[in-house]
Structure formats: structure tokens, C-alpha cells
Amino acid sequence: MKYTLTRIDPNAPIERYPAEKKQTVNDPLQEVGRGILLGKLENVLNSTVNWGRKNSLWPYNFGISCCYVEMTTAFTAVHDVARFGAEVIRASPRQADFMVIAGTPFIKMAPVIQRLYEQLLEPKWVISMGACANSGGMYDIYSVVQGVDKFLPVDVYIPGCPPRPEAFLQALLLLQKSIGEERRPLSWVVGDQGVYRAQMPCEKDLFREERIAVTNLPTPDKL
């Protein structure tokens, strides 16, 4: 599996945010020239740490626009987001693991979103929820940033206007799957300080043949 290695770029211009550089590499555990024992031990240690991270994701209680309503609906008893270990909503970004950009990222709001993202402690992740956060949506105007990934690194995109709560739950599952494949430093003092993220396949491409093969559409009373 191919991985994307992300490191801080000390030579990045001040105008660029975030100041990081990326490159495509192979699985770091396969490239390590160590003995079988140490290699297996590091693999087990990485898997254990990733298992704990992905099953205890604390979201930051933050919303910009109407998609936030659908996000909060996922925390009700009907959908029960506690099944995925993400029911502990935090009021401070310093206590959260990830933030969901749910709504329209206005230019005036972009510096605030950046500051909140910087206050998240590592490891941290970002979910872009809805067409407005993904690409500006129908607001192709001067006051809206055309995609939150213009100033934040996004891990999972949720399409829709607005997406249903089930789409948010699927995004959580995709984020958990991505976290399970990550290779992060086991210490801030020892070893490579880069972050290796697995290049996950696009969900649209995975189910393309299945969608094309559909010939019998359900009637409105069965939807």
C-alpha cells in the first residue's frame, strides 16, 4: 500500500498554510531494515496505538451553518454515534481529537477556523461536511472560501447539501479505517517525526460498477 508522508517544511513561505510538504512513499514498516523481532514488535505497537486512537475519537463541538444540524442529529439516540466511540463532545479544541467543518467557510471565518485547528493537540484530524465545506457549494461568491482544504488539511469529505446523519456516521468509519493504517511517531524524541497516511481509495470509484449495474429502481413508497 502506498502512503503519503507529511513533514513540516521549514522553507515554506509565510503565506502558505499549513507549512508542510508531502511525498508518496511505501509502507514504512516494510522499509525498515531491522530484525524480525523488532519489526513485529513495532508493527504490534503501531496497531495497538492506532486501535486506541480510532475507537476513542472526541469531536469538537463546532458548526458554521446548516450542516451542523445534521451532524448533531447523529448524536441522538436514533443514530447512536456512541457505537463508534465518538459521543464525547468537547467544548474546547484542546480536549478534542478531530473537528468537523459543517457549513459554509466564509472568508471572515477562515482565520477563526485556522486558530481552532491549531489549538487541537496532535494527533488531530479534519472532516469536511457538505458541499459548501468541500467546494463552496452554490456560493461561488467573493465572501466564501471555495473549499476548506484551501487552508486546512482534510482527511474525509462528506458530499451532500446537506448530508444525512448516516453520511456522517460513514465518514467516521472511513476516518477510523484511515487512522488504523496510519504510521505516526511513537515518540516525539526518538525516530522519524513524519506522519505516514495510507492513500485510501475513493468511495465513488469503489461502488461505480455497482451503481451502473442497477436496473430496477424502487418505487416512492419503498424509499
Curated annotation (Swiss-Prot):
Gene Ontology MF terms: 4 iron, 4 sulfur cluster binding; iron ion binding; NADH dehydrogenase (ubiquinone) activity; NADH:ubiquinone reductase (non-electrogenic) activity; quinone binding
Cofactor note: Binds 1 [4Fe-4S] cluster.
Superkingdom assignment: Bacteria
Membrane topology (UniProt): Peripheral membrane protein
Location(s), subcellular: Cell inner membrane
Known cofactor(s): [4Fe-4S] cluster
Pfam families recorded: Oxidored_q6 (PF01058)
UniProtKB keywords: 4Fe-4S, Cell inner membrane, Cell membrane, Iron, Iron-sulfur, Membrane, Metal-binding, NAD, Quinone, Translocase, Transport, Ubiquinone
Gene3D superfamilies: 3.40.50.12280
GO cellular component: plasma membrane; respiratory chain complex I
Reactions that this protein is recorded to catalyse: a quinone + NADH + 5 H(+)(in) = a quinol + NAD(+) + 4 H(+)(out)
Gene Ontology terms: biological process: aerobic respiration; electron transport coupled proton transport
UniProt binding sites for [4Fe-4S] cluster: C66, C67, C132, C161
Enzyme Commission number, as recorded: 7.1.1.-
Record-stated family: Belongs to the complex I 20 kDa subunit family.
Role, per record: NDH-1 shuttles electrons from NADH, via FMN and iron-sulfur (Fe-S) centers, to quinones in the respiratory chain. The immediate electron acceptor for the enzyme in this species is believed to be ubiquinone. Couples the redox reaction to proton translocation (for every two electrons transferred, four hydrogen ions are translocated across the cytoplasmic membrane), and thus conserves the redox energy in a proton gradient.
Protein name: NADH-quinone oxidoreductase subunit B
Lineage, highest ranks first: Bacteria, Pseudomonadati, Pseudomonadota, Gammaproteobacteria, Aeromonadales
